[in-house]
Regions:
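ER/Golgi luminal nucleotide-sugar-dependent glycosyltransferases, focusing on the catalytic module
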Residues: 1-168
Length: 168
């Protein structure tokens, strides 16, 4: 079972012009995947944001984290989220996480410069899938009380998807 809003990641690239569903989705998997309960996508780096984007979107993010201008290590998940999805919104959402996840996720977002894009995973374990969906949707429901649904702009309209993507 997998969950991903970006369908391009799960398509069979050799048959992209086919109209048959079975030709468009992965039919086989890497042999080494048998050794794992869950597989997540390769992480992408968020460092190296063009200066024009920082100037356009990131003024408040720079005020919160000025070292991001001088060092890629300062361009953390938190910095990138502040820049594109509203300054401070990630911190507000993190405060709504259960205690068991809050500190680790806060540390992750303030120190890491890459994450597994697409909120995608494959798992053979119903327990893992159910726990993940329970935790992420309970958290997102709590976030609705703060952010609501009257959000404007691409980065804010899709904020719930972007929160879940970082949580994975």
């Amino acid at each position: 079972v997998g969950f991903c809003p970006y369908r391009i990641y799960w398509k069979n690239k050799n048959n992209m012009n086919s109209n048959k569903l079975k030709d468009l989705v992965l039919q086989n998997y890497e042999t080494e995947w048998k050794n794992y309960d869950a597989i997540i996508g390769e992480p992408i780096s968020i460092g190296g944001t063009k200066i024009i984007k920082v100037i356009k979107y990131g003024k408040l993010a720079i005020l919160r984290n000025p070292k991001a201008i001088f060092s890629r290590s300062g361009q953390t998940i938190r910095w990138q989220f502040d820049m594109f999805h509203g300054s401070g919104n990630l911190d507000k959402a993190i405060e709504l996480l259960p205690n068991k996840d809050r500190d680790d996720f806060k540390h992750f977002t303030r120190n890491e410069t890459s994450f597994s894009r697409g909120n995608m995973f494959i798992s053979k374990s119903p327990k893992i899938i159910n726990l993940y969906f329970r935790d992420v949707f309970d958290w997102l429901k709590s976030c609705e009380g703060i952010f609501g649904f009257n959000l404007e702009g691409y980065g804010k309209i899709r904020m719930y998807a972007f929160l879940a993507e970082r949580y994975l």
